[in-house]
């Protein structure tokens, strides 16, 4: 199995992933150079015209090794978020990488665009990571967080890996790792530095 390194500029971080195919979902006219670009609009650089809120996507299960969601999730209708993330999971191969960048949910960058309807903050990705109280609400397909960064006046970026069902022993370990994550930050405010160092 051949692998390559992918540099995520927003995080100044390198990830090891399998070679292509890689998907740039909602690429607009700014498709990543090494990706297959998908968008609901026919723009320069778009390889496949498809509305990604229309699920399923025209791809086989586990047909790509990486998905980029660069400033797309904030445009996805909130009630479709779980189905959308589950579709990303379906299309990615096991241990595939999902990189999601979005304006921080309470920032001017989020609210300035009249089409932004789905705000994400630093706790939102944990709804997709087994082993914490937020995941237990909807129990979607399972991911693990490899990197999480954010600035409250800028963007949030998260790199997630597709995982399969975890064992009860592993879930206990994960729950211990994420024990500080609570719905609505009931106990203490989220600390930006803490969130950066533990993933």
Question: Which residues make up each language-model segment?
Answer:
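Conserved SAM-binding loop
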Residues: 20-106
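S-adenosyl-L-methionine-dependent methyltransferase catalytic module, highlighting the catalytic core
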Residues: 79-83, 87-199
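A broad, low-specificity signal for short, low-complexity segments enriched in glycine/proline
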Residues: 9-10, 27-28, 111, 124
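Hydrophobic, well-ordered secondary-structure scaffolds
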Residues: 8-9, 68, 131-132
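Conserved alpha-helix/loop element of class I SAM-dependent methyltransferases that forms part
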Residues: 2-20
């Amino acid at each position: 199995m051949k692998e390559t390194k992918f540099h995520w500029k927003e995080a100044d971080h390198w990830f090891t992933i399998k070679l292509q195919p890689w998907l740039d979902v909602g690429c607009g006219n700014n498709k990543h150079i090494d990706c297959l670009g998908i968008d609901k609009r026919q723009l320069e650089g778009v390889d496949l015209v498809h509305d990604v809120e229309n699920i399923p996507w025209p791809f086989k299960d586990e047909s790509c090794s990486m998905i980029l969601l660069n400033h797309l999730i904030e445009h996805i209708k909130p009630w479709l978020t779980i189905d959308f993330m589950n579709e990303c999971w379906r299309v990615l191969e096991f241990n595939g990488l999902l990189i999601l960048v979005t304006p921080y949910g309470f920032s001017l960058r989020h609210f300035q665009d009249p089409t932004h309807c789905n705000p994400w903050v630093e706790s939102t990705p944990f709804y997709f990571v087994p082993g914490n109280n937020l995941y237990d609400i909807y129990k979607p397909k399972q991911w693990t967080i490899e990197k999480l960064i954010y600035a409250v006046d800028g963007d949030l970026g998260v790199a997630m890996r597709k995982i399969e069902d975890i064992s009860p022993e592993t879930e206990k370990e994960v729950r211990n790792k994420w024990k500080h994550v609570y719905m609505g930050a009931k106990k203490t405010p989220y600390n930006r530095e803490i969130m950066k160092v533990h993933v």
